[in-house]
Design a protein with these regions (language model features):
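Metallo-beta-lactamase
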Residues: 47-49, 143-238
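C-terminal regulatory/interaction regions
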Residues: 243-320
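Conserved beta-strand hairpin/beta-sheet module of binuclear metal-dependent hydrolase folds
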Residues: 4-63, 158-170, 175
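Short Pro/Gly-enriched beta-strand edge/turn motifs at strand-loop
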Residues: 9-15, 115-119, 140-142
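Soluble or luminal CAZymes and related metallo-dependent hydrolases
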Residues: 50, 129, 189-193, 287-291
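A structural signal for the main folded, soluble domain(s) of proteins
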Residues: 2-7, 47, 52, 63, ...
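Active-site HxH/HxHxD metal-binding segment of metal-dependent hydrolases
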Residues: 47-52, 56-139
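Divalent metal-coordination and catalytic microenvironments
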Residues: 30, 44, 74, 86, ...
């Protein structure tokens, strides 16, 4: 865990960044400051299988303060999977999400919320209100601007504090790229939205970026350059993005499982809608089985996975 940036930009009083991994998004914790009526808050809560660790980290960081608010930059499972556990632990906590999916949360539509299409897990949680772009939210005594950041997710928001010029970028910008552009999987054009969001970030001129995954970074122009180059490659060859998306979905589930029998993995892939969509739209020249085998081979070749055999001789895929 990394609770402070490596750069020379100090975090504001009360703000702590808990750097997680790739299964769980980073948690940004804001302790209440003297006279802070809004109370303590956390932005993004990680994946469900890490809920116990998330609870312990937040409790330790707040040093006895009760958690008053949960804020989600978007509702992918790695950003809100800890919501339910936190709501159970802190019954009075209020939960705010980006606009666009309130009704889907209230009716718990797992297809619209992406949990069914991705084959990922997220326990049901309640919401209190919305993080409206163009407004501000007060965190540790400072007003953070809320900006719409569609692309990776059409409903995502990012937060910017103008005095410190710190940006919470979610999955709109990482030091070495950005998240899978999920609308594109379904054939919804969204690469232009990614580009527009990168332009928004550039205009904000942040001094320090807190990404959804990975460490904090200050060379924003370099990160934007990497992201735009990557985006240009995806626009020029959408097949590259489709292949990237499939491998990310597979690797992400392997992070959750850590090890899985190849037959069980095949069953999961065949039952997970996004793989069917990707295969049909981009990889139809191969059979589904051939395509899956190529995905596994790609993970093995990159060192992201290892193939072994269990006591019965059946092949097992291990996370690396």
């Amino acid at each position: 865990m990394n609770a402070s940036p490596a750069m020379h930009v100090p975090l504001p009083p009360g703000m702590t960044v808990l750097e997680r991994g790739w299964l769980s998004a980073n948690n940004i914790v804001f302790a209440a400051q003297p006279g802070d009526a809004e109370g303590a808050a956390v932005i993004d809560t990680g994946y469900v299988t890490h809920s116990a660790q998330t609870l312990a980290l937040i409790d330790s960081t707040l040093e006895g303060q009760p958690l008053a608010r949960i804020l989600n930059t978007h509702l992918h499972s790695d950003h809100c999977g800890g919501n339910a556990a936190l709501q159970q632990t802190y019954p009075q906590v209020q939960t705010f999400i980006a606009p666009g999916q309130a009704e889907q949360v209230r009716s718990w539509d797992e297809a619209a919320l992406s949990y069914a299409p991705t084959g990922q897990e997220c326990p049901r949680f309640a919401i209190t209100g919305l993080l409206q772009p163009g407004s501000t939210v007060r965190l540790s005594g400072r007003d953070w601007q809320i900006h719409a950041a569609p692309g990776h997710d059409p409903h995502s928001v990012i937060l910017f504090e103008p005095d410190s010029r710190i940006l919470i970028s979610a999955d709109a910008l990482w030091e070495n790229g950005f998240g899978v552009v999920f609308p594109e999987i379904e054939g919804i054009a969204a690469f232009d939205e990614v580009a527009a969001t990168l332009d928004v970030i550039e205009r904000l001129e942040p001094r320090l970026v807190v990404p959804g995954h990975g460490g904090l970074f200050g060379d924003v122009q370099a990160a934007l350059g990497i992201a735009r180059k990557r985006l240009a490659g995806f626009i020029q060859a959408p097949l590259r993005h489709a292949s990237y998306a499939a491998k990310v979905l597979l690797k992400y589930k392997l992070l959750e499982w850590q090890s899985i029998g190849v037959q069980e993995l095949q069953d999961w892939v065949h039952a997970t809608p996004y793989f069917g969509i990707l295969h049909q739209r981009y990889f139809g020249a191969q059979t589904a089985q051939q395509w899956l085998e190529s995905l596994i081979e790609s993970l093995l070749a990159s060192g992201a996975a290892e193939l072994r055999r269990d006591a019965t001789g059946a092949p097992v895929l291990l996370n690396q």
